[in-house]
Amino acid sequence: MSWWRDNFWIILAMSIIFISLVLGLILYCVCRWQLRQGRNWEIAKPSKQDGRDEEKMYENVLNSSPGQLPALPPRGSPFPGDLAPQEAPRQPSAWYSSVKKVRNKKVFAISGSTEPENDYDDVEIPATTETQHSKTTPFWQAEVGLHSSF
């Protein structure tokens, strides 16, 4: 019984290879037999869509039309669900830093496509985030501390 345990993965790999070869041989024989009888197989072609390359978009909205959707809030305003009216806004914790928008960013247009100037991907991450990470405990030191508690 120990021989089976010692060579389990080798036996499993050889079994997979053997079964694949047997199935391949069976398919080869069936295809050869079908072609000897004179049957031709046609390659299936995709259905034509009247020459239109249109994308269809579906929204997961029940009983509403696009005209009934509310307008988006201004960019600088906080999300209305985040703060209750009686609460004062909190200061961000030490882990977060402010993000400053780059106003004089050069935009390179490719083949006539342009991006809007007030797009969300034109922000700059300040260099102060690097010093915050160096003040924290490295992952391997925290991991050692966790294992010692068990």
UniProtKB/Swiss-Prot annotation:
Record region (Disordered): 63-94, 110-136
Annotated protein name in UniProt: SLP adapter and CSK-interacting membrane protein
Location of Phosphoserine modifications: S65, S77
Spans annotated as Proline-rich region necessary for constitutive interaction with LYN: 70-75
Biological function: Lipid tetraspanin-associated transmembrane adapter/mediator that acts as a scaffold for Src-family kinases and other signaling proteins in immune cells. It is involved in major histocompatibility complex class II (MHC-II) signaling transduction in B cells, where it is required in generating the calcium response and enhancing ERK activity upon MHC-II stimulation. In dendritic cells, it is involved in sustaining CLEC7A/DECTIN1 signaling after CLEC7A activation by fungal beta-glucans.
Distribution of this protein across tissues and organs: Expressed in peripheral blood leukocytes (PBLs) (at protein level). Expressed in dendritic cells, splenocytes and B cells (at protein level). Strongly expressed in the spleen and lymph nodes and weakly in other tissues of the immune system, including bone marrow, peripheral blood leukocytes (PBLs) and thymus. Not detected in the majority of nonimmune tissues, with the exception of lung. Expressed in antigen-presenting cells. Expressed in macrophages.
Subcellular location: Cell membrane; Cytoplasmic vesicle, Phagosome; Cell projection, Ruffle; Cell projection, Filopodium
Pfam entry (one): SCIMP
